[in-house]
Design a protein with these regions (language model features):
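Single conserved hydrophobic/aromatic residue that forms the stacking wall/gate
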Residues: 1-8, 12
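Inter-helical turn/loop segments and adjacent helix faces that build the functional surface
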Residues: 110-121, 144-147, 188-205, 219-235, ...
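Acidic/His metal-coordination segments adjacent to aromatic residues that form catalytic metal sites
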Residues: 71-95, 153-177, 193-194, 242-260
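Long, hydrophobic, well-ordered secondary-structure blocks that form the structural core
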Residues: 103-164
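C-terminal accessory extensions/subdomains outside the catalytic/core fold
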Residues: 13-17, 28-30, 48, 245-341
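Alpha-helical transition-metal enzyme core signature, strongest for iron centers
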Residues: 96-104, 126-141, 176-187, 206-217, ...
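Long, hydrophobic/aromatic-enriched structural stretches that serve as scaffold segments
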Residues: 63-118
Length: 341
């Protein structure tokens, strides 16, 4: 049965006690148990004794990065190119750090306002996961790079949008589907081009956690959204679309290019917006978001043309994250030298 809008609103806008402690033996419970099995300690399970050589790049791709074709980059000395690489990585990872702090805050809110016992337990376990992610990203930036960048205004806007909305399910959509889905794709891509084995190990462990978070969000939201009225579903679909628009802007980081390539902020932004490989990178990240929005019923007729205009509907039929490989997820943590590519 569908809830009335007013009744639903009352449920969304209050902190939610749940005095029914019946443990539902379902996928949410299994994900919670899996999280307990796979807890790792950021202080001792990562090889902090390793430091990447100062004269080597942290990231390296098979093809040239777009900025490497510019005359301003070619004019840099070898030492300046290495320093640019460090700043580029620091700017990107600083946004990861800020995003993980946002995820920490939202997960703690979900433990308070999620309506069911199982969801509260899972949100509490995710809160600890996010705290661990903040810890390890911050330590890597502080100890291994020594450079820190402030939060991207678009990311701050997205986090504020999610944190200040009083409806628990919009927090789920914004965090578990949009932000965590984008993070999962971004972390996977960065891991694939990292030449620093410590960074590769760090990202691999974080990715294992994030995969559980996204699967939790999809499994919990799919059934709930079916109980909403068409108007409420469209409202959430519009929220998801707006979050995706902000997220595309979040993916544009300009500070390191301004510093080393002599670009203005607008020039650096336009360069990234108008460079095909950057566009492909941004769109690729949504390959982990769009199929999940489709799975939970938020690619409505009203928002489909808007996603089409962004060039993102091509991912609609890509694999979603509803199902997970339980055997793969239960594997013991890989050792430092054995992290898969």
């Amino acid at each position: 049965p569908r809830r009335s809008s007013s009744a639903a609103s009352d449920v969304y806008k209050r902190q939610s006690y749940n005095w029914d402690y019946t443990v539902a033996d379902n996928r949410i419970k299994k994900l919670y148990e899996l999280g307990k099995e796979l807890n790792w300690n950021g202080s001792i399970d990562l090889n902090w004794d390793y430091t990447h050589p100062a004269d080597e790049r942290i990231l390296e791709t098979d093809d040239e990065l777009p900025h490497e074709t510019l005359e301003a980059y070619e004019n840099l000395s070898d030492e300046e190119k290495i320093l640019f690489d460090r700043h580029d990585v620091a700017e990107l990872m600083s946004q990861f750090l800020h995003g993980e702090q946002g995820a920490l805050l939202v997960a703690s809110q979900l433990a308070s306002c999620a309506p069911t016992y199982n969801a509260k337990l899972y949100a509490a376990s995710q809160t600890f996961d996010e705290a661990r992610h903040v810890e390890v990203f911050n330590r890597y930036l502080q100890e291994k790079i020594g450079i820190h960048y402030p939060i991207n205004p678009a990311l701050k806007s997205l986090l504020d949008k999610i944190l200040t909305d009083e409806r628990w399910d919009l927090k789920f959509i914004g965090m578990q589907i949009i932000i965590e889905g984008l993070a999962l794709a971004a972390f996977s891509m960065l891991k694939s081009i990292s030449k620093d084995p410590l960074l590769k190990q760090l990202l691999h462990y974080v990715i294992r956690d994030e995969a559980r978070h996204v699967t939790f969000g999809i499994n919990y939201l799919e059934d709930f959204i079916k109980t909403l009225s068409p108007e409420e579903i469209n409202e959430r679909a519009e929220f998801a679309y707006e979050a995706c628009v902000i997220s595309r802007e979040r993916l544009i980081n300009t500070k390191s290019q301004q510093r080393f390539l002599g670009m203005s902020e607008e020039e650096a932004r336009e360069f990234q917006l108008n460079t095909g490989s950057f566009e492909m990178f941004r769109n690729f990240l949504f390959s982990r978001v769009i199929p999940n929005l489709s799975r939970i019923g938020l690619l409505t007729d009203e928002v489909r043309p808007k996603f089409e205009a962004l060039g993102l509907l091509e991912y609609e039929n890509a694999p979603d994250d509803f199902e997970c490989d339980w055997a793969e997820m239960r594997k013991p943590l890989e050792e430092f030298e054995k992290i898969p590519v």
